[in-house]
Swiss-Prot record:
Pathway: Cofactor biosynthesis; coenzyme A biosynthesis; CoA from (R)-pantothenate: step 1/5
Entry cofactors: NH4(+); K(+)
Protein name (record): Type III pantothenate kinase
Source organism: Rhodococcus opacus (strain B4)
Gene Ontology terms describing biological process: coenzyme A biosynthetic process
Any one Gene Ontology molecular-function term assigned to this protein's record: metal ion binding
Length: 271
């Protein structure tokens, strides 16, 4: 079994895969809050508790982290508790198979690279990936699987929390779809601005990408939503085609398998 670990600023998502290649299947996933202060021992204790009887069935680990302190602890955890298990940490220098056609490839987040890989693998077409997480990322992937760049905006929670904390008369509200775009009270007005406002933000960015890049003006372009808040925002958008909740975990699986295949090729007596 392959354990995939997706660490973001807000949540950590674990995914457990059986099989490989076309026969791979995500059989279980878990979600927990990210704590940048967690140690390797604490991470191991939580992971083992969630995995239960599957702990001893892990044959590989593929992980990414947008939180540097957690990435360091995951590296220690893997060495200390799963030292016998092959693992891949997606960071600069790791081969993903995704050409990064940007000014500084080292600046591109591992999550954006992995999402791009999975999107190209699933659809084999020009893709625009919208990840609704702590930040809202709109990433552009060519028909060849190249990462062309994108846009980063604040996430839904960050924007909503900032509005409440910086405004004396406003308070934090539950982020749900209001009954109308025209709010009848302060709570509904804030919910409308958050939900419909972010849907409009995404639609606006996607349309601009399609206008600016000739290769993205056709009907073959696939716009994919993923991330924690995708189920809330996607139904209100006009440009998003597909929802892939496990896109990042799928990308982590692909990175692991590609690196394992490369290692196997290097060990081949035919080389």
């Amino acid at each position: 079994m392959l354990l995939t670990v997706d660490v973001r600023n807000t949540n950590i998502v674990l995914g457990l895969f059986t099989g490989t290649g076309e026969h791979s299947k995500l059989v279980q996933d878990w979600r927990m809050r990210t704590d940048a202060r967690m140690t390797a021992d604490e991470l191991a204790l939580i992971f083992r508790g969630l995995l239960g009887a599957h702990t001893d069935q892990i044959t590989g680990v593929s992980a990414l982290s947008t939180v540097p302190s957690v990435l360091r602890e995951i590296r220690v955890m893997l060495t200390r508790y799963w030292g016998h298990v092959p693992h891949v940490l997606v960071e600069p220098g790791v081969r993903t198979g995704v050409p990064l056609l940007v000014d500084n490839p080292k600046e591109v987040g591992a999550d954006r690279i992995v999402n791009s890989l999975a999107a190209h693998h699933l659809y084999d077409a020009p893709c625009i990936v919208v990840d609704f997480g702590t930040s809202t990322c709109v990433d552009v992937v060519s028909a060849k699987g190249e990462f062309l760049g994108g846009a980063i905006a604040p996430g839904l929670e960050i924007s909503s929390d900032a509005l409440a904390s910086q405004s004396a008369a406003l308070r934090k509200v539950e982020l749900v779809r209001p009954r109308s775009v025209v709010g009848k009270n302060t709570v509904e007005c804030m919910q409308s601005g958050a939900v419909f406002g972010f849907a409009g933000l995404v639609d606006g960015l996607v349309r601009r990408v399609r206008r600016e890049l000739p290769a993205f003006s056709g009907s073959d372009v696939v716009v994919i939503a993923t991330g924690d808040r995708a189920p809330l925002i996607m139904p209100e958008t006009e440009t998003v085609d597909e929802h892939e909740p496990d896109l990042t975990l799928e990308g982590l699986r692909l990175v692991y398998e590609r690196n394992q295949a490369r290692r196997g090729a290097r060990r081949s007596p035919l080389d």
